[in-house]
Amino acid sequence: MSKIRIYEYAKQNNLASKDVINFLKTENVEVSNHMSAISDEVVKKLDNKFKAKPENAKKGQNQKQSNNQQQNRQKQNQKNQSKPNKNKKQKGPKKNQQQERPAAKPAETPGKITYHGTLTVQDLAGKLNKEPAELIKKLMFLGVMATKNQDIDDDAIELICGEYDVEVEKEIILEDTDLDKYIEEDAEENLQERPAVVTIMGHVDHGKTTLLDSIRHTKVTAGEAGGITQHIGAYQVENDGKKITFLDTPGHAAFTSMRSRGAQVTDIAILVVAADDGVMPQTVEAINHAKAAEVPIIVAVNKMDKEGANPDRVMQELTEHQLIPEDWGGNTIFVNLSAIKNEGIDDLLEMILLVSEVEELKANPNAKAFGSVIDAQLDKGRGSVATLLVQNGTLHVGDPLVVGSTFGKVRAMVNDLGNRVTEVGPSTPVEITGLHGVPQAGDQFLVFKDEKKARQIGEAREQKQIDENRGTQSTVSLDDLFEQIKQGEMKELNIIVKADVQGSVEALAASLQKIEVEGVNVKIIHTGVGAITESDIILASASKAIVIGFNVRPDVNAKNAAESEKVDLRLHRVIYNAIEEIESAMKGLLDPEYQEKVIGQAEVREIFKVSRIGTIAGSYVTDGKITRDAGVRLIRDGVVLYEGELQALKRFKDDVKEVQTNYECGITISNFNDIKEGDTIEAFVMEEIERK
């Protein structure tokens, strides 16, 4: 039987909820209020206490009722004979109800239900063996008003099932082009231990490359002449008889671009931090990328051979990013090493093996091969060449496979040592040829039994991608933010904050996190000081985030990446404006307004100081055009120093209205003379735009 609440029991037995609660407390039954649920055993205790007296009272009442019935029976006898059906209808149901109540057992509530699409209240009631009215009542308690034929959302279904301690699972119907549909689940007994896949990340000059080289040259499989003869973006080393696979990804951008395509190839991230330098901006960036991928982090404190090495300082700085050493009560492993002197390399490899053992990394080597693309290119002699990482199963020469939106048959395989191989197992990188097209890094691949099926699915996936590219890309933009919130598509708004100084970053991030509209929270996934970079844009694209710049500008690569990835870039000079814009967008209050459009950039190549005029910047227009009526800002090292108006724009000695790309000009900025060679002057106009 299902549990009932105290107020329901009290109502059924004409009792006060308070009396029931007081009695249960004397019996040491923990209840908080009239809404508390009680078990069958507790119900029996209550019956023994409260039902004895009512039954005696009922006997007296029944006797009086029976006497009255006998007196009236003779009077009603004629009516009963003349109208038998009517009386049967009246008495029948009451009699049946009294007889059937103890006999009829309610259907048991299932332990688990599954569904796909949506459910109406009536459908859910049928699955739970409950009355729709009972579910409608519970939905009302949850603040959801619904009729029995009305669809209810997934959250409401989960809450209702939670009330009955029923596990709920939503079935996802896969399309024929989804590779997940063809991946078979492996039985536990078929799984075997596999090597860990490790990515090394960190600041640009903290010794990532040196560490990779040290591991590569000291731990290459013994007996291989010439060591690594070919670099394929990944390699394996052996330590204590166990293999470890290292991915040589070119920076954090590639790491995240792979993740954005659904590839979760990394098992462990190694964060390299220089002992003499501490945590740097790219270190923080690497931490955020690794956390977003939800992989364990091992901190490698490098350059311990230097005089200024201070590992304690590194530990202290990393605690601010929730990486707390084991010695300080945390769960992050720290390894001190010197990559250039090959000191501590064995300790690092030992820790990697320890973490991989804890993570229980397993795969089925006998399954059809499945994995991800590490890198791919078009070679003049060999055609399409792709570096694959086998994540499950074994890949053989001659296997037909689908890779991303292309397909083919494995013609040849070369391992990380440059040797031709005929088969490779789980967690092994290999370079293959034989594909019809060039896949992208992060694409998934799967081996099929026959080439015809692989071709059919590969062509269908290619057509699907073409159709998707014609449509709009699913990204987050302030323009349609309110619409997404209204449709329930968003519960969290991801934001990346970049500013000119750390104080501004912290102030802006703190203010943005306080905004909450319609149950949508603001989540700051990355902050940093300095110009907006391409890496920021790729992280934003992978995480569906908006980038906010305060007193900083995007570099050329970042600007191009933002356009191609359709990432929303918002640049501000007043913190309040940034906060107001986000809050207004979330509330759906963005009215048509003016938006800045950058029309050109000029590089300052020479400075002329004239007493009556001020500083004249001899400039060369590198992009777009500079117009006389445009607003300008002076940028130095990616940071905006001044924003104002042009005082004069000249070509030789003549005043001009505009100067095009690849032409020189003289620029004077109103009320500003602190101009230096190498500065960038950016021209912009304000255009009226209408919010969609």
From Swiss-Prot:
Q: Where is this region: G3?
A: 248-251
State its location(s).
Cytoplasm
PROSITE patterns for the chain: G_TR_2, IF2
**What GO MF annotations does this protein's record show?**
GTP binding; GTPase activity; translation initiation factor activity
Which Gene Ontology cellular component annotation is one that this UniProt entry carries? cytosol
- Give positions of region: G5: 338-340
Chief localisation class: cytoplasm
Ranges where the record places region G1: 202-209
Which keywords does the record carry? Cytoplasm, GTP-binding, Initiation factor, Nucleotide-binding, Protein biosynthesis
For this protein, the record's Pfam families field holds:
EF-G_D2, GTP_EFTU, IF-2, IF2_N
Compositional bias per record (Low complexity), positions renumbered to this chain: 59-84
Which residue intervals make up region (Disordered)? 51-114
**Ranges where the tr-type G domain occurs:** 193-362
Compositional bias (Basic residues) at which positions? 85-94
Residue ranges of the region described as G4: 302-305
**Region G2, residue ranges:** 227-231
Q: Where does GTP bind?
A: 202-209, 248-252, 302-305
Q: Which family does it belong to?
A: Belongs to the TRAFAC class translation factor GTPase superfamily. Classic translation factor GTPase family. IF-2 subfamily.
Its biological function?
Answer: One of the essential components for the initiation of protein synthesis. Protects formylmethionyl-tRNA from spontaneous hydrolysis and promotes its binding to the 30S ribosomal subunits. Also involved in the hydrolysis of GTP during the formation of the 70S ribosomal complex.
Protein name (Swiss-Prot/TrEMBL): Translation initiation factor IF-2
Q: Which organism is it from?
A: Oceanobacillus iheyensis (strain DSM 14371 / CIP 107618 / JCM 11309 / KCTC 3954 / HTE831)
Give the source lineage, highest ranks first: Bacteria, Bacillati, Bacillota, Bacilli, Bacillales
**GN (gene name):** infB
